[in-house]
Amino acid sequence: LSSHSKIITIEEKPILQSVIKQLDQDSIEEIEGWSTLERSQAQSCYLKEIKKYVEISSSSMIIDKLPLNILNLPFIHNIFPSGKIILAIRHPFDAILSSWMQNFSLNSAMANFTELKRTVQFYCISMEIFDHCEKRYDLDVHILKYENLLDNFELETKKMLSFLGLDW
């Protein structure tokens, strides 16, 4: 996707976490009650954070690739209510084993991958959060199965671009 002229990808930077911290609103009830002005301020804060990493124009489509953003879907939806979500998934066994075997720098999120049982629990909770948010917010989601991408890269990429309203 990053090779598309209209797409800018953000490679696993804690942008959303920084925005959430700056907004100082960490309950779903607070963010769901945002006024138009508060939402606009949150969007401006997000764009300001992005500009620390990449140059963007008004026509840029931004894809934030941090996998753990799945845990912040309520914030994402309330900051960008018409935003599109691409959920890239692998077979659960592959995703869990791969995460557990990674040598991540230890922080509060990565601590979930230090034990296999904890990694399984974290994966399950993440998927439950996604399912709940998809139903609660009627999210506009495209699910990309990693195995399908490997089998037919061009077809799966065209599907994603179509979902985003972009040409191949």
Model-predicted segments: where are they?
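Core active-site phosphate/anionic-ligand binding loop and the adjoining beta-turn-alpha structural block
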Residues: 42
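Post-Walker A helix-loop "phosphate-sensing" segment adjacent to the P-loop in P-loop NTPases
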Residues: 3-12
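Conserved structural-core and active-site-/substrate-pathway-adjacent residues in large, well-folded domains
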Residues: 1, 46, 123-126
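PAPS-dependent sulfotransferase catalytic domain
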Residues: 15, 19-35, 55-168
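Short, well-ordered alpha-helices that flank and scaffold nucleotide-derived cofactor binding pockets
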Residues: 2-3, 78
